[in-house]
Amino acid sequence: MKEKDLYKRFVNETPKILHHRIENFIGVGFPDDVLYINNKFYTCELKCTDHNKIKISPFQISFAMQHPIGHYFLIGHKKEVKLFESKSIDDLLKEGFKAKNPIANNWKDIRDYLYKL
């Protein structure tokens, strides 16, 4: 799975959310997707991996640590998907996709969680 495919699937799976894809030239470490949900903005970093390890840049780590609320990581691994809060950054770095604290680990639960924000 590639990041662009994960983004397309994310948009298709969450039709009630307005997504704004951010290109890399905006700012180093700024998240890939700005979400507009129930009149509020949130950010989401999209990551894909074929292995357990997740590649997260130092700038993305810094952003996650500075924004512990309202920032998420959507991780695609082969045919699986998980959503994590940014405050889980340490676990993601240590445990990768197998981190034990996702908010949701399938599209239905991701959609249900985000729609309630």
Which sequence ranges carry the predicted segments?
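Short glycine/proline-enriched coil/turn segments at helix->beta-strand junctions
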Residues: 14-17, 38-39, 67-70
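Nucleic-acid nuclease catalytic cores
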Residues: 65-91
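Short amphipathic alpha-helical segments and helix-helix/interface helices
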Residues: 7-11, 60-65
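Active-site-adjacent loop/helix micro-motif of nuclease/hydrolase catalytic cores
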Residues: 43, 50-61
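Conserved catalytic cores of phosphodiester-cleaving nucleases, focusing on short active-site segments
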Residues: 33-35, 40-50
